[in-house]
Amino acid sequence: MNSRVPATQSWFSSHLPTTEPDLEPATAAEGSTTETATLSPETTSFNDTRIPDVAGGAAGVGTMLLSFGIITVIGLAVAMVLYIRKKKRLEKLRHQLMPMYNFDPTEEQDELEQELLEHGRDAASMQAAASLQVTQGKSTLPSQGPLQRPSRLVFTDVANAIHA
């Protein structure tokens, strides 16, 4: 086995490095043990691709910064457009919902109380007028009574009559 090692070294030294080294396969006649030859980096050559020397390193950095700046400006413009559209949409919605926001239930309650009082007075005055006419002997149809002004209470009266 030791006699084989110098032969391998002489074989490596006799062959010049090529792109495809000629390796002879081991045959079974040489011995029962198979030996593998290892190749050193000096004997094999790889594709000799080199990175070109960048003479203008600042130009590459400048191009990269320019592209980054353009992308940033486009991104900011898109963000501003989306922000403005959102503000306009919210403003439009606010104007549509403004009557709901300005609703004050206390003011509405005061108006309803006034109408109820007026309606009660009108009903009391109609009953008083009807009883006065009955005592005087004049009969009038309900349709001939004093005209009532229409109010929102008509709807509440109908609702109260339904629930009663």
UniProtKB/Swiss-Prot annotation:
Residues 24-45 have a biased composition (Low complexity). It is a single-pass membrane protein. The keyword Cell wall biogenesis/degradation does not apply. It is found in: Membrane. Residues 106-130 form a coiled coil. InterPro entries: C3orf18-like. Keywords: Coiled coil, Membrane, Transmembrane, Transmembrane helix. Residues 1-48 are annotated as: Disordered. Residues 1-17 have a biased composition (Polar residues). GO terms for cellular component: membrane. The chain crosses the membrane at residues 64-84. Its main location: membrane. This is Uncharacterized protein C3orf18 homolog. It comes from Mus musculus (Mouse).
